[in-house]
Amino acid sequence: MAEKQTAKRNRREEILQSLALMLESSDGSQRITTAKLAASVGVSEAALYRHFPSKTRMFDSLIEFIEDSLITRINLILKDEKDTTARLRLIVLLILGFGERNPGLTRIMTGHALMFEQDKLQGRINQLFERIEAQLRQVLREKKMREGEGYTTDENVLAGQLLAFCEGMLSRFVRSEFKYRPTDDFDTRWPLVAAQLQ
């Protein structure tokens, strides 16, 4: 019984990995059909549906992976790092680095892969970015408690600016067909971004 569960879990992972790879390829800029995905995995469409009730659920599983990966690591940053600017830098670098290492998932994060899918998936990504923005806002607000001095600019504006920078770099990565990596020249870009945090 345990072997059967492991085999099923492995097949589910294989399907999700194939979907992510298809999103990374030129197929990712078009609607991905279950027929194309089944051919990529080497199974029938019926076999896909034995593991996932719908293509929406496949995308939902990838979004869960993105969310778990980012939120878990953000929480580790918040636990380990106490300096506000360092925290913000690490969170921004985490988001950009995750996108760079997972180009297919970046198409989901930017919404490009979801244009042809159900609206609820875009809603899930919106919620993820709202959670990240709330985390950034909280870090910005805690500066006054931790360091004795807050920002003169509203923390909502600053959090939105940091998130817009991340989203812009991820969109540029997708638009360039993954040529312009989000972390390229980060050590030069970060001081420009950090200078806005006043």
Swiss-Prot record:
The encoding gene: slmA
Keyword Membrane among record annotations: no
A GO biological-process term: negative regulation of division septum assembly
Example GO molecular function: DNA-binding transcription factor activity
HAMAP family per record: NO_factor_SlmA
Organism of provenance: Enterobacter sp. (strain 638)
Main location: cytoplasm
Pfam families documented for this protein: SlmA-like_C, TetR_N
Assembly behavior: Homodimer. Interacts with FtsZ.
Protein's name in the database: Nucleoid occlusion factor SlmA
